């Protein structure tokens, strides 16, 4: 059974988060904002020959729906896509809502937050178990806050997000090489950590509008979809409290306010974004022709096949 809190139970939310390394808040997202996004998304995914960068393969992928009409790959930083204004504006309204910033303030004690990275999932990609700290975190560590937004009622067979409650108080794994060259070793070390501590995965089949927040040291991931008729439409976003230093980031770009003055994005060079869009076409074509493997694989099934 999932423990959930109403958005007004702020102190209980904070206490549960600090004790367990995650917390679920019921109906934090307005249904109208979700429905507006889904309407724009259905228009967006019908576009032919649109290439985006995927989080699960860390390379460009083509918009291509499966037999059930779901997009197989996650979209990295969907709010930054070009030639998709209706889509990106509805993404922004969901992940930067006042309800979200109020919860972030309660958890961090800071008024303002910056979005470091976000993703959209149509179908579960079966994300391998990990700690966010390896990829991105604050300095001093442990102040990043991540959130998973359910955009529909999530069926248990859809490839649920999972957490290991209390694992944020256990061992924290560090990156040991630049450019994520030790990523496969990190995945292996994480599996060893899970085994040695008998960590148990807690599935989180959220209801539409629920949001799950978690700590950067918390072990989490997503199960593989076991019933193709179920999608798992959801956002993930990572937030840094304003004024915090960022691990492994010597310099940071200028920040700009979103539609919510308490949530910021990094300022984008839109010319470069448009040029990168066309470069992604070339990279996708080359990857398909050469059968190039992803540099950093996030799909758990790929590691299961290797073992």
Regions found by a protein language model. Give the residues of each.
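Short catalytic/ligand-binding loop motif for oxyanion handling, primarily in non-cytosolic enzymes
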Residues: 33-35, 125, 156-157, 171-172, ...
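A short beta-loop-beta micro-motif enriched in histidine and acidic residues
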Residues: 132-144, 199-200, 206, 230-231
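Short, structured patches in soluble enzyme cores that scaffold and shape functional sites
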Residues: 119, 131-133, 149-153, 165
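Short, conserved beta-strand element in jelly-roll/cupin
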Residues: 138-156, 205, 213, 238-242
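Non-heme Fe(II)/2-oxoglutarate
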Residues: 2, 47-51, 55-58, 66-70, ...
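Short edge-strand/loop segments of extracellular domains
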Residues: 123, 164-171, 232, 238-244
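Non-heme Fe(II)-dependent double-stranded beta-helix
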Residues: 1-19, 26-129, 135-138
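Double-stranded beta-helix
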Residues: 15, 154-219
